[in-house]
Amino acid sequence: MDKKPCNSQDAEVRKGPWTMEEDLILINYIANHGEGVWNSLAKSAGLKRTGKSCRLRWLNYLRPDVRRGNITPEEQLLIMELHAKWGNRWSKIAKHLPGRTDNEIKNYWRTRIQKHIKQAETMNGQAASSEQNDHQEACTSQMSNGPNDNTIDQTYSPTSYSGNVDTFQAGPNFLTEANDNMWSMEDIWSMQLLNGD
């Protein structure tokens, strides 16, 4: 069933990005009249937007106490602690981070923290699989050599590596690309704090 506008005024509802003029109208209206019933506020302010659109624009972007800028390491740690405690209850978490919106925290979690967790799980799975294969190969090698064979088992361990580290070549963007895909020590320490290590 298609939704059809009940009157000609509903057909004029504007969608898409907000203009600076619309932002100023909404800010001034709320400054003079306060927040109220959002559907009537949109019409009273002269905005051709839905009440929901006005409410979300105000709460997520225009409110004076909305904090701008990157999430700090302290905020990140708090988000991780509260998420471990409450899960995806973003509004409840946002109440403990003044000036941050639930939507901003959710987006931060999904784009930064959750991404790193999935990468770490993938890397741990690959490392465990690799270690298991190495162990199986070492056992097979020792068994095929037999107990009376005088050859020395040459399995790799970090302390036995004698390669030249100076031969490593990195491109000009190595550090910036690596920082986007790797965890900092603060990230690792904060994860250990959550795990009780």
UniProtKB/Swiss-Prot annotation:
Spell out the Polar residues composition-biased ranges: 138-158
Q: Which UniProt keywords apply?
A: Activator, DNA-binding, Flowering, Nucleus, Repeat, Transcription, Transcription regulation
Any one of the GO CC terms: plant-type cell wall
Against Gene3D superfamilies, the record matches this protein to: Homeodomain-like
This protein's name: MYB-like transcription factor EOBII
Which CDD domains does UniProt cross-reference here?
Answer: SANT (cd00167)
Write down the species: Petunia hybrida
Single GO BP term = regulation of DNA-templated transcription
Kindly list the GO molecular function terms attached to this UniProt entry.
DNA-binding transcription factor activity; sequence-specific DNA binding; transcription cis-regulatory region binding
Give start and end of each HTH myb-type domain. 10-62, 63-117
The protein's job, in short, is: MYB-type transcription factor controlling the production of volatile organic compounds (VOCs), including floral volatile benzenoids and phenylpropanoids (FVBP), in flowers of fragrant cultivars (e.g. cv. Mitchell and cv. V26) by regulating the expression of ODO1 and EOBI, key regulators of the shikimate pathway, and of several biosynthetic floral scent-related genes including IGS, PAL2 and CFAT. This scent, mostly produced in the evening and night by the petals, attracts the pollinators (e.g. the night-active hawkmoth pollinator Manduca sexta).
Q: In which tissues is it expressed?
A: Specifically expressed in flowers, mostly in stigmas, petal tubes and petal limbs, and, to a lower extent, in anthers and stamen. Also present at low levels in roots, stems, leaves and sepals.
Principal localisation: nucleus
Location of this chain's protein in the cell: Nucleus
State the conditions that upregulate or repress this gene: Circadian-regulation with peak levels occurring in the early morning hours and lowest levels during the late afternoon hours in flowers.
Q: Where the record puts its DNA-binding region(s)?
A: 38-62, 90-113
Q: What happens in the null mutant?
A: Impaired expression of ODO1, EOBI and several biosynthetic floral scent-related genes (e.g. IGS, PAL2 and CFAT) leading to reduced scent production in flowers (e.g. phenylpropanoid volatiles including benzaldehyde, phenylethyl alcohol, benzylbenzoate and isoeugenol). Impaired anthesis enter and premature senescence of flowers. Altered cell wall modifier transcript levels in flowers.
Region named Disordered: 125-158
Any single Pfam family the record assigns to this protein: Myb_DNA-binding
